[in-house]
Each structure stands twice: as C-alpha cells, then as structure tokens.
C-alpha cells in the first residue's frame, strides 16, 4: 500500500497523537458541534496556533459523509497543474484512504493522477486531523492539488467533480483550503478580504477574480474556492455563510503584517 507521509507534522500541528488531540480540543473549545446540511466550505490552512480556531468553526458544522473532497492550492510548484492523489494518507491520528472510484473518474480529464504535487504540500494535509477528530466512522478523502488556478480551469474541475459525485450517489462534502490576504496590515487585509468574501457569499466567481486582480489580493486558494463553489452550486447549494473571520495578528499581536483567515460554509 502506497502511503503519503505527513509533510508538516511537528510544524503546522503537533507530531505526537496525544498532543495533537489536545490542540484540536483547544481549537473546538467553546464551539457547539451542530451538524448542518453543508455541501462545501472554505477553511484556512495555517499553523493550528494561528488558524485552528477559525477552521474549527467549519468543522463543527460538517455532517458525516462518505467522502470529503479537499481542494488545496499548490504552494511548492511540484507536480501536474491539477493533480489528484491515490495514496493512503497518514497523520499522527491514523490513516485515511482515498476514494479511488471518484479519483479514477478524473482520469483522462484536466486532472492528473500525480503524487508529486501532494508530497510536500501542506494545504490539504492540515485539514485531515480535523476530520479525524470530528468523525469516528470510516470516511474517505479525495485530495486535489491545484497549481493552475485560472477561472476556466477551476470551473471545469468543479463541474466535473459535481458530475462524478452525482453519478456515484455518495454523500460528499467539498472543502476549499485557502488563507486570505498575506502580509498586509490588519486593517487593509480586512478591507481586501471583505470584498473577496462578499463575492464568495454571492457565488460571484467572475466578480471574485476581478476583485483579486484589481486589488492584487494574495488569497492563495482562489482556484480551490472556485472549484468548490461551482461544484456545490451544481449539487444544489444556494446559500453561503461566513462563520468567522480573523487574522494571525489576533494571536501574535502583530497587526502590521498579518494573514487573513475565513471560515465559510455552503448549504
């Protein structure tokens, strides 16, 4: 069995199982676990110290599913422009199998089966312990890493995913892993991110790209967000809700150069 080893355990989140469980417990502290009919979500992927509590706002609402599809931006530049992983993923909390039926449905499309893009990438990996902490029953994942994030590509991937999910009859939740504005003041980050988030909440994909380019916004997972919105809408999603917005300065105290984080769900 081919295994995708953790790349950022001990960096973005604790390496040891017990310590990781304690950190996840801290992230969910004060949140009510209330499952909703969530089809898609936007979730941050920074170190748990900074964005874990924001991410927990999403995971506290997620329903049980057969498969959790996770779109992540490719920060490393390795691998195919858009790649799906077929390997089993290992975390300090255990192993998670990939939904090979859905993964193989992409073969022959714009999405390649390629492990290199996933090997060192953190954006998908950091979501997995949250799923393992929340759900005891077996579930599978579909990790899709996007180096090519233009609107046409992301919409095509989202439409294809929605068709595959519909044909499979499986219950799936689609997660777009993305941080928002990077290394601006807290005030400016919130100003830029508010515009981008407004487009997301209105399912206005073209408007989001326009605002990203016009504001030179450093949102890293706009392709994953677009693919998630496209697929969720095609599967019946009609309402998007911002659950939480914060920035790294809320933890570090440094408001001069922050990273923005948003928790958004689509129902």
Swiss-Prot record:
- What name has this protein been given in UniProt? MEMO1 family protein MM_1761
Q: Which InterPro entries has this protein been placed in?
A: MEMO1_fam (IPR002737)
| Family from the record | Belongs to the MEMO1 family.
Q: Which species does this protein come from?
A: Methanosarcina mazei (strain ATCC BAA-159 / DSM 3647 / Goe1 / Go1 / JCM 11833 / OCM 88)
The record, for SUPFAM superfamilies, names: LigB-like (SSF53213)
Query: Where does the chain cross the membrane?
Result: none
């Amino acid at each position: 069995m081919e295994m995708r080893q953790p790349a950022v355990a001990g960096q973005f989140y604790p390496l040891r199982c017990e310590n990781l469980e304690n950190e996840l417990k801290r992230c969910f502290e004060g949140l009510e676990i209330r499952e909703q009919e969530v089809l898609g979500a936007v979730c941050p992927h920074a170190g748990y110290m900074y964005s874990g509590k924001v991410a927990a706002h999403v995971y506290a609402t997620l329903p049980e599913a057969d498969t959790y599809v996770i779109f992540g931006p490719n920060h490393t530049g390795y691998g195919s422009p858009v790649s799906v992983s077929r390997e089993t993923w290992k975390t300090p909390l255990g192993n998670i199998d990939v939904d090979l039926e859905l993964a193989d449905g992409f073969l022959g499309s714009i999405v390649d089966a390629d492990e290199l893009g996933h090997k060192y990438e953190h954006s998908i990996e950091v979501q997995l312990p949250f799923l393992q902490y929340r759900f005891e029953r077996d579930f599978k994942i579909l990790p899709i890493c996007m180096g090519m994030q233009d609107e046409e590509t992301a919409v095509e991937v989202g439409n294809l995913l929605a068709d595959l999910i519909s044909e499979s009859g499986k219950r799936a939740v689609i997660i777009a892993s993305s941080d928002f504005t990077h290394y601006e003041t807290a005030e400016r980050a919130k100003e830029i991110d508010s515009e981008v988030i407004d487009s997301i909440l209105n399912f206005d994909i073209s408007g989001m790209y326009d605002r990203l380019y016009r504001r030179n916004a450093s949102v890293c997972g706009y392709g994953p967000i677009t693919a998630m919105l496209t697929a969720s809408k095609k599967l019946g999603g009609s309402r998007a809700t911002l659950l939480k917005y914060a920035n790294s300065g809320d933890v570090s105290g440094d408001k001069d150069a922050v990273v923005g984080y948003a928790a958004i769900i689509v129902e």
